[in-house]
Design a protein with these regions (language model features):
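Acyl-donor (CoA/ACP) binding surface of acyl/acetyltransferases
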Residues: 1-40, 74, 78-184
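Conserved GNAT-fold acetyl-CoA-binding loop/helix
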Residues: 41-62, 73-75
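Short loop/turn motifs at secondary-structure junctions and domain boundaries
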Residues: 65-70, 156
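A general structural signal marking secondary-structure boundaries and capping sites
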Residues: 40-41, 67
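A generic secondary-structure signal
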Residues: 62-63, 127
């Protein structure tokens, strides 16, 4: 079978929907994004790794090469009028042969309750479809009702529980699998 040329990419100016822009994070975003990687509650809900400030800087510096390879898109979510970082989103675990990708998202506490997470999830999925993806998956920790509501509002369908999935810290938890197909 021929190797797929499907790659994850995003326009330099990012993606936008309403007043939310998804763009590549810069080193200027470190202080705004750091709580997502240091706050235990945010990390647990978002399946985010623990990063010190220095580790986050190093990670942000590495993102361009990962994006260039076409296998990971990690984007900052910005409230457009103020250029204020409100969260982030990823397209990751690309299976180019089967045209499947996973999404991830987080919203900082000050931006919650405004539909930002749903907007991020929908933007990422629509962008993935524009690249030729045929299935977008979202894994949500069992019991994370806020995130379950996000993916449901974004149009995802609940498929069931996947047992003993790894988290960035090595623990294993059960997750609910949701998916979205083009046209849904």
């Amino acid at each position: 079978m021929a190797e797929s040329t499907l790659r994850l990419s995003v326009p330099r100016e990012g993606l936008s929907a309403g007043d939310v822009i998804l763009r590549f994070p810069s080193l200027d975003d470190v202080d705004a994004m750091l709580p997502a990687f240091t706050d235990p509650e945010l990390r647990e809900a978002g399946n985010l790794p623990a990063f010190s400030r220095e580790e986050l800087v190093a990670s942000l510096r590495e993102l361009p090469s990962l994006a260039e390879a076409g296998r990971l898109l990690a984007l900052a979510a910005v409230h457009a009028p103020a250029d204020e970082v409100v969260g982030g989103g990823t397209l990751h675990h690309l299976d180019a042969e089967r045209k499947i990708v996973e999404i991830g998202y987080f919203v900082l506490p000050h931006a919650r309750g405004r539909g930002v997470a749903t907007t991020i999830a929908r933007m990422l999925a629509e962008h993935a479809f524009s690249l030729g993806i045929e299935r977008v998956a979202a894994y949500v920790n069992v019991g994370n009702t806020a995130s379950e509501r996000v993916v449901a509002r974004a149009g995802f369908t609940r498929e069931g529980v996947v047992r003993s999935m790894p988290k960035p810290d090595g623990r294993r938890v059960d997750k609910t699998l949701y998916s979205l197909l083009p046209g849904e």
